[in-house]
């Protein structure tokens, strides 16, 4: 008898209402181990609101969501992180006055065992743990080719490198699920290509399931296995990239019914 697969993330009729507005309604999403899933839709469709629900920033007013079979409703943001969900934001949130290395080391703090006394008086055990944490952080920086910037302040990194640092720091939390909120926003083509390779590396090396919000359709279509399309807070369609690209409802709602007479209904609009 085949073993039943348990989704890493499963939302069931997930929703939230602000006053009389249903910002997200009846959303059902499943993500399995190792999958890279896209979440697309027009601006204001509710994509980031879904991320805020999953990470505990907002509390659902309807439905539920589960991480590896564990019900997550009602958990605080730090409890969600401890459970294994990490995210990046549309606006980069780094400790800009700390070095690149320190930004990643901070994410390892939950694994450190030294107590307050050892930290204050800088005991040998403290320095041992500090060195081990620095090495783990450096190993992550190497994966993203950021080790050469380790001693620079985070605010001095080029924009694309700051995005990669944010992902590296998220990886340090030992997550079970990674949420990427428009990671390619503001990037030039070279930086976007570097981001694409880094995401592919994450999947191949760590098999971390990823839920990606992105307006760069060429990026989404080239790396995602499945895509959910959100419109007015509800799932409009889901399927493989080629199915989404040829879905008439999606083309009208998001990809754009542009110049159909001249170009055969091009589907490469950025929404």
Each model region followed by its residue ranges:
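Glycine-rich phosphate-binding loops of nucleotide-dependent enzymes
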Residues: 2-271
